Amino acid sequence: MFRGATTLSLDSKGRLAIPAKYRHALSLDCEGKMVCTIDIKQPCLLLYPLPEWQIIEQKLTRLSSMNPAERRLQRLLLGHADDCEMDKNGRLLLSAPLRQHAGLEKKLMLVGQLNKFEVWNEDAWHEQVAQDMDVEREGDFTLNERLEDFSL
């Protein structure tokens, strides 16, 4: 399980180095094989270990290509999906189109989300966190059924 936010740098070839604390688990769980795609709601990327991505693909195959909304989701997620494999130094190459979608330049944030990572431009990440905190402080939100019973 992935948790926490880590500041990383992209090298000149568009590679990011996976933090050491995740490398061993990724090597064991998926032999360093991952899939990266766009987040369709946020300016970030979603980086999945291959077994987790295969679960997403199974769900996507059950969608109808005749339904415009379902076809759109398939097109966006699968059309941007890119296989990535950690090299011996724990680095992953992010394709130029993926980097462009998330506005990735030199500094980025790798954010653990239990079964996947989000990859953000560092400034965009800090802006998003500030916005999320403002919404929580203002109390201007509606709890859905799953959040009503959630407690920290």
UniProtKB/Swiss-Prot annotation:
Just give the chief location class: cytoplasm
InterPro entries per record:
MraZ (IPR003444), MraZ_C (IPR035644), MraZ_dom (IPR020603), MraZ_N (IPR035642), MraZ_sf (IPR038619), SpoVT-AbrB_dom (IPR007159), SpoVT-AbrB_sf (IPR037914)
- Source organism, top-level taxon: Bacteria
Please provide, in alphabetical order, the Gene Ontology terms of the cellular component aspect for this entry: cytoplasm; nucleoid
Q: Which residue intervals define the domain SpoVT-AbrB in the entry?
A: 5-52, 81-124
What does the similarity note say? Belongs to the MraZ family.
The entry's protein name is Transcriptional regulator MraZ
Native organism: Idiomarina loihiensis (strain ATCC BAA-735 / DSM 15497 / L2-TR)
